Amino acid sequence: MKGKKLNPEHIREVIRLADASNFSQMMNIEIMEISDEYAKVKVNFEDKHRNTLMNIHGGVYASILDTVTWWAVYSEIPERIGFTTIDLNVNDFSMHRGGTLYGEAKAVRVGRSIAMSEGWVKDENGRVLAFGTSKLMVLDEKSSLEVAIEGLGYAPLPPKFIDIEE
């Protein structure tokens, strides 16, 4: 019996491109892992992530959660199909004063038109600082990552999935 799995070559390339994006560079977001229904990112916390009161800006947690929950769903969406966040709910539990932040997420459900994922932001000691859920709308091919990358003039991505014998 044949099945499909994520192509490691595809994942390496999308991580490389995502990490090089202007937003990821500005926020210091680095993707550590994308696998079946799961993603993990890290953020090297700097002063630019602080608000006027010198605490972490709440938008940092939101950005981490939006990013990591999107990538957790990515593995479950068919190739050349787009999707976007339509609702992000963030619960801040604790301030972060310094050090590396980690975001982890898992896909909860991926349907034909709506997907749902949940994620956590943790500090270096594994303490949960924020929790969030993301609702995403599944779109068409015009909104896919593959089409966007080609539109930017980059080489086409390797196939997202590869066949396997089960």
Language-model regions: role of each:
Residues 1-166:
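Terminal targeting signals and extreme-terminal segments of soluble enzymes
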